Amino acid sequence: MDSDEGYNYEFDDEEECSEDSGADEHEDDLELGEVELVEAGLSGSERAGICGEGGGSALGPGPGGEEEEDYRYEVLTAEQILQHMVECIREVNEVIQNPATITRILLSHFNWDKEKLMERYFDGNLEKLFSECHVINPSKKSRTRQMNTRSSAQDMPCQICYLNYPNSYFTGLECGHKFCMQCWSEYLTTKIIEEGMGQTISCPAHGCDILVDDNTVMRLITDSKVKLKYQHLITNSFVECNRLLKWCPAPDCHHVVKVQYPDAKPVRCKCGRQFCFNCGENWHDPVKCKWLKKWIKKCDDDSETSNWIAANTKECPKCHVTIEKDGGCNHMVCRNQNCKAEFCWVCLGPWEPHGSAWYNCNRYNEDDAKAARDAQERSRAALQRYLFYCNRYMNHMQSLRFEHKLYAQVKQKMEEMQQHNMSWIEVQFLKKAVDVLCQCRSTLMYTYVFAFYLKKNNQSIIFENNQADLENATEVLSGYLERDISQDSLQDIKQKVQDKYRYCESRRRVLLLHVHEGYEKDLWEYIED
């Protein structure tokens, strides 16, 4: 291995990767570049072009949108993340004095916990440590250099492709296994691009578990896209292992948000994506991360399909095939060719004792029949309840997508108004109204998740009243904004829009404050699903 003392990565000017270390004691000494203030309570990213992008440190809003507390964070670029990573490696190397790429592998093995690495490093068993980390102790004499005794002009076969090349065309790791550079390049490219491996790429020799160091990878790969992918992969664990760092969940965004303490608070990336730092989902006030996670799982898995089957079908009492009733008669005949059982849909008993009771079962009140019917009714009620909340959740989600498209329409309306002797400041009420509308849609969407898991009590009734009031006002505001605004109706509609979005803001604040008050005073009781 040709080990360089430096740890240099050159990032593509047009693309970035990201990574960050633990709670870095010396992070204040790093030049993190300029940061911007971000209002974390604003709505989604689609307003680019009307609203500016966010980034840098932020003031976190209170539950109603007001800035009740500081929740500061930084949005870090690839270079800034790499600075943190290199600084962490440098701090460790000041003590253990190994090549930087070896130290990076050691830190990765210990999930970037410097204290754990130091403790193991000085416990007196270095050979065991390096063996566990799958690297050769750099203090040992290199077997690779001992083997380089052939003349560079003498050809030798590669043990992968079996083609002959000069000795100078071969390279390897400290384990002593050498292969031609072409095979190395193709091997590394396959591992990085197709298998998504970065920090755990081992020597291609059969049975050898020695890891490929970063300098070797960067030296043997010539494709800049593969290098960039590798940079993303090796730094990923750096972010994932640090509770103060979180990747932006937006597709193709490689920024990282760094906070001073982890919490379920809204943060906004420079790309415009606002998300919950705790769970990484879109900001979901007023529902807590725990319940949102359960809701998403419930929506994604087949549990509701099972509920529908339980509510609308029954099993044949003989062969247990699932049967759906498609007529009014209770006389059921199993269509399974190997069964053909005849039974009563109501009590699931054999049909023969029923005589002429084609539409009514006189054994309806028997314990077994009652238990089966009660179970079916419970399943049906659970399904109907789920569909009630799910439909409203999805409706607001769909409306929110439509509302985001309003930004483009509003921008056009604002430009038209300015051409009719209105100033820029006079038309800003439209943008503000769409901002409020999107905030209300998002809040309403997540109130239905909150309500789904909420047990009924006096406080839940107040919550539902607040929810209904906000929902009605939001629909009225949406209707105002979708109207065609003529010059004659401008002043009238302007007053209505301003009054309504201010009312929506107020009602949204009341709803959120009530929910958060319930959290603080432990007023809410939940249905465990």
Curated annotation (Swiss-Prot):
<keyword id="KW-0677">Repeat</keyword>
<feature type="binding site">
    <location>
        <position position="354"/>
    </location>
    <ligand>
        <name>Zn(2+) 6</name>
    </ligand>
</feature>
<feature type="active site">
    <location>
        <position position="329"/>
    </location>
</feature>
<feature type="binding site">
    <location>
        <position position="253"/>
    </location>
    <ligand>
        <name>Zn(2+) 3</name>
    </ligand>
</feature>
<dbReference type="GO" id="GO:0004842">
    <property type="term" value="F:ubiquitin-protein transferase activity"/>
</dbReference>
<dbReference type="Pfam" id="PF00097">
    <property type="entry name" value="zf-C3HC4"/>
</dbReference>
<feature type="binding site">
    <location>
        <position position="339"/>
    </location>
    <ligand>
        <name>Zn(2+) 5</name>
    </ligand>
</feature>
<feature type="binding site">
    <location>
        <position position="284"/>
    </location>
    <ligand>
        <name>Zn(2+) 4</name>
    </ligand>
</feature>
<dbReference type="GO" id="GO:0005737">
    <property type="term" value="C:cytoplasm"/>
</dbReference>
<feature type="binding site">
    <location>
        <position position="175"/>
    </location>
    <ligand>
        <name>Zn(2+) 2</name>
    </ligand>
</feature>
<dbReference type="InterPro" id="IPR048962">
    <property type="entry name" value="ARIH1-like_UBL"/>
</dbReference>
<feature type="binding site">
    <location>
        <position position="361"/>
    </location>
    <ligand>
        <name>Zn(2+) 6</name>
    </ligand>
</feature>
<feature type="region of interest" description="TRIAD supradomain">
    <location>
        <begin position="154"/>
        <end position="365"/>
    </location>
</feature>
<dbReference type="Pfam" id="PF21235">
    <property type="entry name" value="UBA_ARI1"/>
</dbReference>
<feature type="binding site">
    <location>
        <position position="161"/>
    </location>
    <ligand>
        <name>Zn(2+) 1</name>
    </ligand>
</feature>
<feature type="region of interest" description="Ariadne domain">
    <location>
        <begin position="380"/>
        <end position="529"/>
    </location>
</feature>
<dbReference type="GO" id="GO:0016604">
    <property type="term" value="C:nuclear body"/>
</dbReference>
<dbReference type="InterPro" id="IPR045840">
    <property type="entry name" value="Ariadne"/>
</dbReference>
<feature type="binding site">
    <location>
        <position position="319"/>
    </location>
    <ligand>
        <name>Zn(2+) 5</name>
    </ligand>
</feature>
<dbReference type="InterPro" id="IPR044066">
    <property type="entry name" value="TRIAD_supradom"/>
</dbReference>
<comment type="similarity">
    <text>Belongs to the RBR family. Ariadne subfamily.</text>
</comment>
<keyword id="KW-0479">Metal-binding</keyword>
<dbReference type="Pfam" id="PF22191">
    <property type="entry name" value="IBR_1"/>
</dbReference>
<keyword id="KW-0862">Zinc</keyword>
<feature type="binding site">
    <location>
        <position position="344"/>
    </location>
    <ligand>
        <name>Zn(2+) 6</name>
    </ligand>
</feature>
<keyword id="KW-0833">Ubl conjugation pathway</keyword>
<dbReference type="InterPro" id="IPR002867">
    <property type="entry name" value="IBR_dom"/>
</dbReference>
<comment type="subunit">
    <text>Interacts (via the first RING-type zinc finger) with ube2l3. Associates with cullin-RING ubiquitin ligase (CRL) complexes containing neddylated cullin.</text>
</comment>
<comment type="pathway">
    <text>Protein modification; protein ubiquitination.</text>
</comment>
<feature type="binding site">
    <location>
        <position position="183"/>
    </location>
    <ligand>
        <name>Zn(2+) 1</name>
    </ligand>
</feature>
<feature type="region of interest" description="Disordered">
    <location>
        <begin position="1"/>
        <end position="30"/>
    </location>
</feature>
<feature type="binding site">
    <location>
        <position position="316"/>
    </location>
    <ligand>
        <name>Zn(2+) 5</name>
    </ligand>
</feature>
<feature type="region of interest" description="Disordered">
    <location>
        <begin position="49"/>
        <end position="68"/>
    </location>
</feature>
<dbReference type="InterPro" id="IPR013083">
    <property type="entry name" value="Znf_RING/FYVE/PHD"/>
</dbReference>
<feature type="zinc finger region" description="IBR-type">
    <location>
        <begin position="228"/>
        <end position="289"/>
    </location>
</feature>
<dbReference type="InterPro" id="IPR018957">
    <property type="entry name" value="Znf_C3HC4_RING-type"/>
</dbReference>
<dbReference type="InterPro" id="IPR001841">
    <property type="entry name" value="Znf_RING"/>
</dbReference>
<keyword id="KW-0863">Zinc-finger</keyword>
<feature type="binding site">
    <location>
        <position position="347"/>
    </location>
    <ligand>
        <name>Zn(2+) 6</name>
    </ligand>
</feature>
<dbReference type="Pfam" id="PF01485">
    <property type="entry name" value="IBR"/>
</dbReference>
<keyword id="KW-0539">Nucleus</keyword>
<feature type="zinc finger region" description="RING-type 1">
    <location>
        <begin position="158"/>
        <end position="208"/>
    </location>
</feature>
